[in-house]
Every structure is written in structure tokens, then in C-alpha cells.
Amino acid sequence: MTKKKLIAGNWKMNGTLGANAALLQALRGGLEAGAYQNVDVAVAVPAAYLAQVQGLVEGSAIALAAQDVSRHEAGAYTGEVSAAMLQEFGVRYVLVGHSERRQYHGETDEQVAEKAQRALAAGITPVVCVGETLAEREAGQTEAVVKRQLAAVIHLNGHCISETVVAYEPVWAIGTGRTATPEQAQQVHAVLRAQLAAASEHADRIRLLYGGSMNAANAAALLAQPDIDGGLVGGASLKAQDFLQIIAAAA
């Protein structure tokens, strides 16, 4: 079964009202000018800009994504944003378990699984992020780490795991300019695909994204791998031309 590739931009904690408008105008123009109907495109924006970006992408091929969601339904959780709130802004995807959330906010595998569950219940596709640190890779633990991270999500959401997207982001390659080789990335994606296949008969439907310094120069080689179904793009998604080149590589 042929899946549409998914190229999702993660703006992280970047943007201004003016810069967002200019970036999305350029992105819309580029998408309308090119033949990219076979690629799904999303932008994950800071929560403060969800309303603005919802308006800016309306009627376009760009789907709105959020960078995080609360594992709680509602209530006294100051600073958190619920899945129901994201749903009201037309959010289609939400990142859960990004390495920066795990690293700086101490998110556990179980909490990430709960966030995925909240998103799924609200009809939002969770983009479940998994990946190993440099120390873990050098200790030969890559496979064990990503399988452990994904297992928690499968355990809690097994019945609808085929409704998720999984992103492999080697932590040592995020924002460092270092990239996993296409072969290294494919090796891990194949492990994840096998783990998903053991949990769901619809594993072939699940899109596996690569997220670790994907850019215009390396996107085509990464996306040519059999189990890489798209990209979770950081820095390059803040420049319209770079992001469009990655989308073109997926088309």
C-alpha cells in the first residue's frame, strides 16, 4: 500500500506574528505552484500562535500541528493545553514525547503514552517521538531504547496504534548538524516497523518519520529508504525555500 509521505515542520520556540505570516505566505505560494499533492504537509507551532496559524493555513494544503498536549483532560494544571482545546483550533497532529520534552521536562515513556491517548480520543493524530542519545548509541542500546519508548505507547494505545505517526529522532543528531546516515536511519525504522507489525495488522499504514537534522541536502537520500515515510523537520522548516525543497524531495 502506498502511503502519502508526511513532511512536518517543528518550529520549536520560534516565531513572531510577522515572521509567521511571511513564512506561511511563502509556503502557501510554493505549495500552490508545485505539484505536491502526494505529500502531506504540517507545521507544529507554539501554542501561543495556534489561532493565528489556523487562520493563515485555512483553505491550504498545510495541516496545523501542536508541539505538545496535556495528559490530563481538564482542570487545575496551570500552563497546560488539553486535547479538547487543540481540537477547537482545528489541530490535526500533535507531537508527543519530543526529546526536548523528555530531556528538559522529565517526561517519562508512560506520560508520553498518556498524551498520545488523549490526542487519539480527541481525533488528533499523535506524532510519537522516539530516539536515543549519543551515549546510548555508543553503548549499543539504540534498539532497546527506541523499542522501550514505543512499547509504552503500544501498551496503552494498542487498539488504535495504527492511527498514530511515529518519528525517530536520534537525539545526537538534533540541531547538531550531525545526521544519521540513510542506512543508520533505515535500520532503526525497520526495527520500529517490525515492533508495530507485531502489535497491529495495519502496521503498514503507520507513517514513520525521520527527525534529526533533515535538510534540503540530505532529504532525498533519507526519504528513498523503504521504511522512511517522511520527515519531522526542525530548523529547515523556518525557511520557506528549505522546507519546500524537502517537500519536493518527498514528492
Swiss-Prot record:
<dbReference type="GO" id="GO:0005829">
    <property type="term" value="C:cytosol"/>
</dbReference>
<dbReference type="InterPro" id="IPR000652">
    <property type="entry name" value="Triosephosphate_isomerase"/>
</dbReference>
<dbReference type="GO" id="GO:0046166">
    <property type="term" value="P:glyceraldehyde-3-phosphate biosynthetic process"/>
</dbReference>
<feature type="active site" description="Electrophile">
    <location>
        <position position="98"/>
    </location>
</feature>
<feature type="binding site">
    <location>
        <begin position="10"/>
        <end position="12"/>
    </location>
    <ligand>
        <name>substrate</name>
    </ligand>
</feature>
<feature type="active site" description="Proton acceptor">
    <location>
        <position position="169"/>
    </location>
</feature>
<comment type="function">
    <text>Involved in the gluconeogenesis. Catalyzes stereospecifically the conversion of dihydroxyacetone phosphate (DHAP) to D-glyceraldehyde-3-phosphate (G3P).</text>
</comment>
<dbReference type="GO" id="GO:0006096">
    <property type="term" value="P:glycolytic process"/>
</dbReference>
<keyword id="KW-0963">Cytoplasm</keyword>
<dbReference type="InterPro" id="IPR022896">
    <property type="entry name" value="TrioseP_Isoase_bac/euk"/>
</dbReference>
<feature type="binding site">
    <location>
        <position position="175"/>
    </location>
    <ligand>
        <name>substrate</name>
    </ligand>
</feature>
<comment type="similarity">
    <text>Belongs to the triosephosphate isomerase family.</text>
</comment>
<feature type="binding site">
    <location>
        <position position="213"/>
    </location>
    <ligand>
        <name>substrate</name>
    </ligand>
</feature>
<dbReference type="InterPro" id="IPR013785">
    <property type="entry name" value="Aldolase_TIM"/>
</dbReference>
<dbReference type="GO" id="GO:0004807">
    <property type="term" value="F:triose-phosphate isomerase activity"/>
</dbReference>
<comment type="subunit">
    <text>Homodimer.</text>
</comment>
<comment type="pathway">
    <text>Carbohydrate degradation; glycolysis; D-glyceraldehyde 3-phosphate from glycerone phosphate: step 1/1.</text>
</comment>
<comment type="pathway">
    <text>Carbohydrate biosynthesis; gluconeogenesis.</text>
</comment>
<protein>
    <recommendedName>
        <fullName>Triosephosphate isomerase</fullName>
        <ecNumber>5.3.1.1</ecNumber>
    </recommendedName>
</protein>
<dbReference type="GO" id="GO:0006094">
    <property type="term" value="P:gluconeogenesis"/>
</dbReference>
<dbReference type="Pfam" id="PF00121">
    <property type="entry name" value="TIM"/>
</dbReference>
<keyword id="KW-0324">Glycolysis</keyword>
<dbReference type="InterPro" id="IPR035990">
    <property type="entry name" value="TIM_sf"/>
</dbReference>
<feature type="binding site">
    <location>
        <begin position="234"/>
        <end position="235"/>
    </location>
    <ligand>
        <name>substrate</name>
    </ligand>
</feature>
<dbReference type="InterPro" id="IPR020861">
    <property type="entry name" value="Triosephosphate_isomerase_AS"/>
</dbReference>
<keyword id="KW-0413">Isomerase</keyword>
<keyword id="KW-0312">Gluconeogenesis</keyword>
<dbReference type="GO" id="GO:0019563">
    <property type="term" value="P:glycerol catabolic process"/>
</dbReference>
